[in-house]
A protein has these predicted regions:
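RNase H-like, Mg2+-dependent phosphodiesterase core
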Residues: 1-209
Length: 209
């Protein structure tokens, strides 16, 4: 299926497969945003959608423009049975590593759902530390409506945080690179130094110099 920002995609096949196996239950999609950047928290979102809901333009957040993600963000919140956004901050990332921090953020998001989820469909191939019944789905953000919705909530929430950080520290260019390791970001770090929001475990070589 080709990405389509104006039409509607039916992304319910994976959820329906689970419903057929497990019975009708409250199923949440879970995804994270910001595993790779040099700065800021890693965010996760969990979303329970009404069964069969088709939102025009819903897709993997990476396939959508920033404008489209921002437009879908309140629509997902409005239509969802439940949704939650959580994170693990840069200190936690440095202490427990990024993989464990990703899973911690996901578990926190799932735990905040009200009503609670009875089954989680998690993007990727790792469900370590997830306490509720779950299944992982590689490239789930482009295959599952629930995960696609979660990917948008997580991405938009994190991008908003980085824009606020840019207002506090405009010399680093966070609004543009969103904390990723661009040449401009590395140059800013060399010129101005590390901020508390930088992930030291990602920047050991720079700290050593």
């Amino acid at each position: 299926m080709r990405p389509n920002e104006t039409g509607a995609r039916d992304l319910w096949a994976e959820e329906e497969r689970i419903f057929a196996r497990e019975g009708t239950l409250r199923l949440c999609g879970v995804d994270e945003a910001g595993a790779g950047p040099l700065a800021g928290a890693v965010f996760a979102a969990a979303v329970i959608l009404p069964r069969g809901l088709v939102l025009p333009g819903l897709d993997d957040s990476k396939r959508l423009t920033e404008r489209r993600r921002e437009a879908l963000f309140p629509l997902i919140q409005e239509k969802a049975v439940a949704w939650a956004v959580a994170w693990a901050d840069e200190r936690e990332i440095d202490e427990i590593n990024i993989l464990n921090a990703r899973m911690l953020a996901m578990e926190r998001a799932i735990a905040q759902l009200d009503p609670p989820s009875e089954f989680a469909l998690i993007d990727g191939n790792c469900g370590r530390g997830i306490s509720c019944p779950h299944e992982t789905l590689v490239k789930g953000d482009s295959r599952s409506a629930s995960i696609a919705a979660a990917s948008i909530l997580a991405k938009v929430s994190r991008d908003r945080l980085l824009r606020r950080l840019d207002e506090e520290h405009p010399e680093y260019g966070f609004a543009k690179h969103k904390g990723y390791g661009t040449q401009a970001h590395y140059e800013a770090i060399r010129k101005y130094g590390l901020l508390p929001e930088h992930r030291r475990s990602f920047l050991k070589n720079l700290e050593a110099k």
